[in-house]
Amino acid sequence: MNNRPIPRNQASSSLGRNDLKPGLFGRSSFRVQHYSGTNGISPIGSSPRTKISPRYSFASSFATSESSLRESSYFDERPPVQDTGVPKSSGLYYSRASPKELSSIDRINDSSFNGIVCAGKTHLGLYKFSPQDKSIDCMHDFVSAGNDGNRGSNVQMGLGKRSKRTKLSTIADVKAGFHNHKNYVAICSNSTVLSIYDINKTGSIDNPLVTNCSQHVRSVNSFDFNMVQTNLIISGGQDSCIKIWDLRSSRSRTLSRADVNINTASDSIRDVKWMPHPTACRSASQNDLRSGVGGAAGYKFASIHDSGLLLKFDLRQPNQVEKRINAHSGPGLCLNWHPYQDYISTGGRDGKCCLWYVGDGKPGTDFLQAGNTSVNTPHSMTSNLPTNLSVVPDMTINCGFPVTKLKVRPCYEKNVLNSLVSMSSMAEDFGVSIYSLARKYIPKYNLSTSSASLGFVWWDDNLIFNIDKDNRINGWYLDREPTVLDNMPKIVTRWRDIEGNGLLFIDQDRGGYQVNDEVPANIEESKKPPNQRVSINSLSGTAGGGNSGGGSNSGMIGSIKKGISQTGLTSFAGERPALSKTGLNFSNKSLATQSMNNSHSNSFSSYAGAGPGPLNEVADYSGIESPFLMTIDLPYILNNMRVSQLPPERKSLYSPEVQAIRESPVKVFKFLAKELEFSYMQEGRSGEMKNATQLSNVNEDTTKKDLMVKFGISEKSTWTALVNKKNEAVEAISKKSVSTKEGSESLIESDGESSAKSHESDDNSSDADKKENAKDGTMHVQEKIDILLELIPICGHNASVYSYIDDLPNFKIWILIRDSLLWDLERLSVEYPDEKLPETQSTDQIGQPITMGNDDSLASDTRSYMTSDLNYFVEEHPRALRSDSDEPKDHKKPLSGLKSQLTKIQETEASIDDSLNPPKMLKKPDNPIKQEQIGSRLNDDSDSAVLEDDDNEEKSDFDTQIKGIPITNKRQPRQSFIDTYMGGLKSPIGSSNANNEFFMGRVGHSLGHSSPGSKGSPMASLNNGEFTYPGFKRMSSRNDRRSSGSLFLSPLKRRESSTAEFFNKSPMRPLSPVAPVSSFKSNPTEFLPPWNTRRLLKQIFKQAVEMGNILLVVNILFLFQNLYQLTSTEVLKNTLAQFIKILHKHELFELSAAILKCSPWEVVINADGGQSLVPIFCDKCGKLITNEPSKEKFTLEAQEKGNSMPLQRFGYWYCDSCKKPNTLCVFCERPIKTLAIGLLECGHEGHFQCLQSWFLDEGMAECPGGCMNQIRL
């Protein structure tokens, strides 16, 4: 920039009268009248500044030199900037880390000095930036040690002797003065005192403090300097009072009484601003035509309140409110006047930035074209009413975050839509966003820093400074910063909403941020008259403070009027600049859509002209169209095709409850977050699963033995013993197979004896360490099996939750995960040795269906169930052990084929062992049976695991483990998932149950899409009503154990279909087992199946991250991270921390607490509560308790003594100002030193423990203070 700094002795000078030529401020046809030479005397008699300098510079800092500015009469019109590509250099030009905490920033309004002022809790610094060196240097700190501005005023304020370092309040932002008072800066020394500093007094003997303004009884939230009457400063705070101070009336260091008091009769004031002076942006003739009076920029001001109310006042009539606008649905946080137009921008906690027209007349530019014919509207017919509320803003920008700081770029534009509005929020991951009013959906610039922005200020129309939470000062040149459109990709395709119903594409024509003023368009008429002046009595109450100060207000207002008449600013007649008559360019299509939307967030205001005339000539306007969004509802069409094929009773997919949930994505998110299971861990789990031998006690052993005797099961039950018992049961019916059975029994017994002998010899040769390792491995496998048995019902439950809201993609994902877990469970059970099963297995795992004949009269509860292997959970039930009742009697086959199959297997043993058991691939097992199992399994893999005999009998997977168990019947062909899904869905219980409404229920709707089971699977026997899944009896028993300590008690579990019913009724057909892991040691990736659980979970996790499915991401990480190691621990902790923040935003605090409680990972949450302040006021003197002197005193004492005992006497239960303690406990009459106190209805306070002892332990019902107040407990 060419604004070069000047020497120290010339720092107080500014542009003289001769230097202030019309061309300095003129632009286009707007000519500035000369300052009157006779009225050049300043009304400020003792003010240190006597010259007036402009607040903003309108020329580019690099395009025009200072001399050319003074010689030229007009500014050149700059055409709209055309985007030519992404700029190569970044706009970040200045960056400096401050050693002290920063909270606010403002510019020094002196064009000859490149300075900004920054304030923090212990810092008020003057900074100078150099464009040549790209540096920012701190010139002086006004509150550092030895430069305490309050050291001479502490006695007058009654605060006693303070410490060397002053603590400033960070509630309100620092502000700098204008023109004659441009060397003044204002900051709150504490929450209720406004302090004025002189930045020219930087010497060691100078006191920079000018005065203190202290009349507010509660915190000051905002203050502002007047641009015209520079000696006036306005302030507003929590006491809902607006106070105006005249710095000329300060005869001492303290102003204890404001010159003007206005009680707004509303809630607390968040922000208050003077109307800025137009600084010669229009001619005097236009102003006179508009208002007919002199300039009113020094009189008007506005305030915004906690209720979202925007009030506009005129100082000449302080008892009346000119405009009263309900600006926001929630608290309004900030406001900012447009520098050159009659508009106010407001920001609120509702995440909206609204633009309001607040002029007295009609706007020169309409957002929606208004015709010349005046139409009576409800607003136009209420001119005589005391109030006139503005309902619809002229422009609304939905930001998505609370707008805490808001400023309009100080640059004049003919069209107000070309103005830039910058805003920021103190929330995390937010910098400074700059929007163009011409394009409110996409910001023009996003100025991001390493941490959240705390404040910013425009130095000129191109340079903006901001500070962040890392205490860094950053400066940005916007002409070097790429726009958001430059970095936005054109090729983007997304699902339209959470239902996945349609696709979104973006228009390839990006457009720009400027409004085209050339092409007019016909817009339908929409009128809105100006708001009328509102009496202060029309508010919620009459202003007490305003009336009380009426006597002094009249003299003050007269002085202000007299001072304004002497400033020579009478040539700047008119209140605000008139807008150009050149029309805006809105298209019919974009405005037709907007005209139908009457919402608060997507609306424009329009005004009707009074009639023909120079000011009422309104042209056609047009704006920038939004990008075209084209949708393809292909999933919707396919879904309708699927619904049309369903039975009539199933076409009513959504119940009223589901429709209520699907109304908004927020309700869907809350429902899923509450219903889904996020963890299988609970309290006491580690103690319950220490090892396999501690899973049961003596009572369980006794129950097990009793049931084994009842069902006729021996204690050493094996698969071979089951075959023998089966053959013995069949012996009475099939007498022809006696010899075959005896041969098979002798063969199996001989093999069993040989295997037992070899196993005994191996055990004798092994040492104790080998036995211990085998035992540990068995226990480790058992623990994995137990975890899988916990995860499988959770996956089923999550699938049912997604099916309840008809979210089919996520439903299929959880069904796929469930089937992969079943595959893992099958692998573990295959590797689990039968002889090493824990003796404490639950008895409902031991059961085998033995059904003779085809008698349908037999009840299912009288049948016997036998098994001794965990394969029963997932394996297909062998046909050799199944009842023949499920097949016609004509197709029954005798068991004589057993001997031939066993003989055939024995003949191939030698070749299998020689060819498939090389030394490098496999170790020699402990017994020949295990070696034979491995060899046969590898043979199955190489030869497609199918051995067909002459009868087309298919060998089962059991024959890879236990030699001598045939599969006699061929499986029926399986039905694919698509066939089941698109065809008629049948009940999993069977067609015989006509009254079954399993698929008509909420959860049943999801289960109908489960993968079907084949007739060879154990679940297929459910359809015939002859078999119940005993393996899931164990799951249901575990669910009972989990229900007491479960993470979330889902409401779906209390409905008709529970999780156990889901698995009892779901037609599952798990995948076939593969070879053990030991057989893949040569090349693991070559034999890794596509349904491998870890690979599948990683793919699902990656897809969920890309699609932004946070619930699925957290579910997968929480459930499967410890078992499958899907990602790093750092990524897991960051994901969990972000998910906790999302839950807090949706007010799901109980759910987030439960997740943190059951999380096995330590998650550090940067809670926003660390930024909260709890102000404590003294009960005696009413002042804010800070106790900084006593804190430093006790700290020094602790350092001298070398221990922390003196610090225990420090607290906030006493006041350093009045030297008195706060209210004592009503029970023990001791100071209350903690924030956890009990407050009774009568007003007495006490320790929580004392009141608990009085009311609960002693059973008292009266106040312990003796006031006879009855406490109702």
Curated annotation (Swiss-Prot):
Superkingdom of the source species: Eukaryota
CDD domains recorded: mRING-H2-C3H3C2_Mio-like
Record organism: Zygosaccharomyces rouxii (strain ATCC 2623 / CBS 732 / NBRC 1130 / NCYC 568 / NRRL Y-229)
Gene: RTC1
Region feature (Disordered): 1-20, 69-93, 521-559, 741-777, 839-861, 880-971
Similarity comment: Belongs to the WD repeat RTC1 family.
Compositional bias ranges of the Acidic residues kind: 941-954
Chain ranges of zinc fingers (RING-type): 1225-1267
Keyword Zinc: yes
Segments annotated as WD repeats: 119-164, 166-207, 215-255, 327-366, 448-486, 639-679, 784-824, 1058-1101
UniProt function note: May be involved in a process influencing telomere capping.
Location(s), subcellular: Vacuole
Molecular function terms from GO: zinc ion binding
Residue stretches of biased makeup (Polar residues): 1-16, 839-848, 898-909
One Pfam family it belongs to: zf-RING_16
Record-level GO BP terms: positive regulation of macroautophagy; positive regulation of TORC1 signaling
Protein name: Restriction of telomere capping protein 1
Skewed-composition ranges (Gly residues): 542-553
